[in-house]
A protein has these predicted regions:
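Short hydrophobic alpha-helices and adjacent helix-cap/hinge residues
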Residues: 2-9, 14-15, 19-31, 44-206
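Hydrophobic h-region of N-terminal signal peptides that target proteins for export
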Residues: 36-44
Length: 206
């Protein structure tokens, strides 16, 4: 098992060297929500799809990448054109991401959103978002992405314990929080900032 790898960016080699202050974060989220509202005013989603909740999650995806680095000499790191985000089993979220990131970049790259319907379609994305799925399908996904520099993220209770690297959950006061599976990160080839770990709930500790 690999040791946990840390990064600590400075202002010269990454967009942000520290987590945003509370006022800055609130302003950032308000602006994103306003933009999303304008973009999505004519969009149609399933009745049970919470646009506000998933807009916040879309913002989190980009924020996570500010504190994660992909290893050198990999297709993810050296891809000159796009930052690839694959979404498994949630077409509404895929469409929302396309609307939000059609003019925005992640790690200085244009964002390409891919819909995935089964594990065999996974093609080394930078980030893979996994919606609620069966244990069998999740096991197949994690087997395919194990020991690869693909950041796995979900929003289903128990998925972090099962091997997903980052999982969203709702706190008791209905705030979006996230947990990180430390062992899953250790087994990946990703470099993660201690600053991200410090604000997450940690699961899978040795």
């Amino acid at each position: 098992m690999r040791p946990l790898k840390f990064i600590d960016y400075d202002a010269n080699n990454h967009a942000s060297s520290r987590p945003p202050t509370a006022p800055m974060a609130r302003l950032y989220l308000k602006l994103v929500l306003l933009i999303a509202t304008l973009l999505l005013s004519n969009a149609s989603y399933a009745a049970n799809f919470d646009v506000r909740e998933y807009t916040l999650k879309a913002v989190f995806l980009e924020r996570f990448t500010r504190f994660i680095d992909w290893p050198e000499d990999t297709s993810q790191k050296n891809s000159p054109e796009s930052f690839i985000v694959s979404v498994m089993g949630n077409p509404e979220f895929s469409e929302l991401l396309r609307n939000i990131y059609q003019t925005q970049k992640i790690q200085g790259k244009k964002v390409s959103i891919q819909d995935i319907n089964n594990p065999s379609e996974i093609q080394k994305p930078h980030l893979l978002f996994i919606s609620d799925t069966s244990d069998e399908t999740l096991s197949s996904i994690l087997e395919l992405t194990r020991d690869t520099p693909t950041l796995t993220i979900s929003d289903t209770e128990g998925f972090a314990e099962k091997g997903v690297m980052i999982n969203f959950f709702m706190s008791r006061n209905q705030k979006i929080r996230f947990e990180i599976n430390e062992l899953a990160v250790k087994e990946s080839e990703l470099y993660i900032s201690y600053k991200l770990l410090s604000v997450a709930k940690i699961v899978g500790e040795e």
